[in-house]
C-alpha cells in the first residue's frame, strides 16, 4: 500500500523516540502488504478499531500513542490523519470527521 505521509510519522517519533520502532514496524507492514478489507488488517493488528468511513485507530506502544488512518482499499492508499499521545487522542472531538 502507498502511505501518505511518512513524514508525519517521522516528525512524531523525533518528538517521542520511544514510538519510533513500533511506528516503523507499522509502516513496514502497510508498505509491503495489500489489504483488501478490514478483516485482513484485523488478522495482523488485532487491537485495531474501525471507526467508520474507512478510518482505523491503531494503538502504538501499548496504549501510550494512537495512530488514525483512512484507507482507500481500491487505490491501496493509506492517509495518516493523526498520530499523537493518548491524551491528545482523547481530546479529539469527532474522529469520524478528521
Per-region residue spans from a language model:
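Basic, Lys/Arg-enriched alpha-helical interface segments
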Residues: 1-64, 72-77, 86-98
Amino acid at each position: 500500500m502507498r502511505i501518505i505521509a511518512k513524514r508525519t510519522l517521522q516528525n512524531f517519533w523525533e518528538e517521542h523516540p520511544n514510538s519510533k520502532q513500533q511506528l516503523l514496524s507499522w509502516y513496514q507492514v502497510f508498505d509491503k502488504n495489500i489489504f483488501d478489507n478490514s478483516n485482513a488488517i484485523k488478522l495482523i493488528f488485532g487491537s485495531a478499531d474501525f471507526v467508520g468511513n474507512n478510518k482505523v485507530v491503531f494503538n502504538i506502544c501499548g496504549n501510550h500513542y494512537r495512530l488514525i488512518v483512512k484507507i482507500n482499499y481500491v487505490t491501496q492508499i493509506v492517509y495518516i490523519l493523526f498520530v499523537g499521545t493518548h491524551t491528545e487522542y482523547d481530546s479529539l472531538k469527532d474522529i469520524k470527521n478528521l
